[in-house]
Amino acid sequence: MYHKADKTMIKGYKYRLNPTPEQIVQMEKTFGCCRYVYNWALDLKIKTYQGEKRSLSAVDLCKQLTLLKKDDNHLWLNEVSNECLQQSIRCMDSAFTKFFREHTGFPKFKSKHRDKNVFKNVNSVKFDFENNRVKIPIIGWVKFFANRSFDGKIGTITVSRSSTGKFYASVLIDDGIPILDDIQ
């Protein structure tokens, strides 16, 4: 069998977090800011298309986000990780792409009560399995219940809160194992 040299296996792991009360407050802020930025970017993209008949890319929206964060009325956006906010913009942009390419539903504005509270990070995340903790930007080291460990490069970490109020970290790992060709 031959290996596909450019593709490797991606595995997902989910851990239940045990944050301190201060970390819970910071996570709630991050959930709210990410939801706000998603809705802001969706609104801006729709209005720009309706008014100027042009589409804003995720890069354009991230540049606009930098300006928004400097506005006196939006300084509170600086209290959370910029990476999470940019990931919200990328998620919204991805929803638009799927709408046009795959004919899925038109992207909807996020609601605090209807939608799941999540935020994503791509860089600067570290796991310490000896002490059962994960380092999340701005939030710091958060304890978690470790039922298994992993080896490989961390891709994306998604922090979420369930409807029961429990916090989880889902992490995608590139374990470096090549994907095998299909057997015929």
Where in this protein do the model-derived segments appear?
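Nucleic-acid substrate recognition interfaces
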Residues: 1-184
